[in-house]
Amino acid sequence: MLKFLYYYLRSMRLYYGFVTATTVLAGLCLAHGTYNELKLSWTLTDLPWTLRDAALLAMGFFAWGFNQIFSDWCDRKEDAINAPHRPMVTGALKPLPAFAVSAVGLAAIAVAGYLMSPWTLAFLALGGALNIAYSLLKRVPVLNCLVYAYAISCCALFAIAGIAGRCPNGPELEFVGDWIVPAHFLMCHNSYFKDVEGDRAAGVRTLQTIWPRVAKFVSVCCPCLAVLRLNFLSWFNVELFVLSVIVVALVIVFQRLVSHSMFHRATCLNCQLCVLMLLFHFIAATWLYAIVSLVAIQLLFLWYNDEKE
């Protein structure tokens, strides 16, 4: 039992849990405040923060891991080359018991979400459908990242519905489309750099396998131009400027790690970059969470120290 739990937790890739949890937090910030896109300002409303927010954050954190079990099974052909030491590939983690645990976990999230608001089921179903579509479209460059981005962004919509008891409104949907979706697109795009060898062998087409220079251009220019635009619109607000410098530095370091085939450290940095991008507009209120998340991701990567896993 302990052996199964150990390999199940490793297969959950807990560091990615902070990506979905942070997406939930971004959704909660939208529900708890009013975001002015012209002034790039976020103002808290009277909606109180409660244990329900904490419950939604926990759901977001574990949702990635529960789903990752199914993804590992579907991707075992590519993983046999890219990550041959993963428990699902080596046989250390038995599929059926792992599927059962994940199914129960996802069902618990669905029930808890429904009790908060029936709207949550719609976004849970949409995210699940898009995740299946992503698995089927992995061989289609750009579209694969776009579908993935919309799938994970459903976490923010799930959070808004769960805490506010309503469907997300127009400005909230616009923010998700303008910022949260691109942040996840970038993370998915960056994740393919480490998989070039296995993807080529398995016939998976990504920008990294067919147009590597374009892939690098997207990885560097998109986040840098995004934060530059926000700084220009905010007349170089000090907080945003400092955070922008950090983001640009992480982008540069990420590319250096990739160029030296240091993919394990690059994956860690990719996670941290995504967390910062998601919280970019709300950093004044979420800076403590951001620091804890970045440190936790770094520490978790010490446990996941096998680059082939």
Please identify what each model-predicted range represents.
Residues 1-309:
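Multi-pass alpha-helical membrane architecture of UbiA-family
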